[in-house]
Amino acid sequence: MANVAGESAETVSTQMTAVWNNFDDGSKSLEYYADVMTALGAATASSTAEISEGLQKFASVAETVGLSYEYATSALATITATTRESASVVGTALKTLFARIQGLQLGETLEDGVDLNKYSEALDKIGVSIFEANGEMKAMDDILDETAAKWDTMAKAE
């Protein structure tokens, strides 16, 4: 990956250690994680260095709310490529977003009065439930998949 990314082996090692520590569940190799970043960097106007820098900002929170490595890297690469904000800024924004969701999962009410019920009600209006049949909150990947499936049917105000 160092050759493809144009980074030093030391830099890539640090980046991949952060990814490995937060996303590894034993089912994928380190090469897989590197390949995903390299492919996303090539497919978007972002680099593997940007993707890994941003991931270091929010990976631990993303994993906690059930956001997979694939979704996390895709979101980061897409937002970075689209906005051209620095990966650090995008990563911090995603960390804040997912930390808020994590707090809502734990039953907190945010400073603006928003609680999980308000998010749940908004998504219910478009036919997306954030809860499993047993009352547990679904993984973020599943919520995003269901929301994406409804995207074309939503009005602009939604």
Predicted segment positions?
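Amphipathic alpha-helical interface segments used for oligomerization, scaffolding
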Residues: 1-158
